[in-house]
Amino acid sequence: MTDDAAEVAVVGSYNVGLTMMVPRFPTGGETVIGRDFAEGPGGKGSNQAIAASRLGAESSFIGNIGTDRYGDEAVDLWESEQVDVTNVRRSDDSHTGVGFVIVNEEGENEITVAPGANNALNSNVIRSARPTIEASDCLLAQLEV
């Protein structure tokens, strides 16, 4: 980063996407055999923080994750992408957010999200991040948490 890099603060969610391809969506009570399973990081806020960093901004993420494997992987990802994690809170009471995505052969998807620790993002968390927010040139929020 350069001294004149923009500072971007992102308030948002982190979710792990668990994605499976299916020939068609199941109907109620039906099991459909899928293929091509993938697991990967996501969440609109997290994605924005990483994108800002990759574009040369000094990027900070403000959000909540669990104290589980997915939360550990999130911190590792952000640190490898040079996203500041000072304002990331870890929850012992809830899991890191996950999204279950099924995609049919036409490319349409159905998504179910278990937000977990994302739901603990509240005004107290935002107030504690105030110095980061005030120092930023840009604040991004997606209204999803």
Q: Where do the language-model regions lie?
A:
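Glycine-rich phosphate/adenosyl-contacting loop at the front of the ribokinase-like
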Residues: M1-N64, R69-D76, S80-V83
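Short, glycine-/polar-rich solvent-exposed loops and beta-turns at beta-strand/coil boundaries
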Residues: D92-S94
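Ribokinase/PfkB-type carbohydrate-kinase core domain
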Residues: M1-Y14, N64, D72, D76-R90, ...
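Short alpha-helix plus adjacent loop in nuclease-associated cores
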Residues: T96-G99
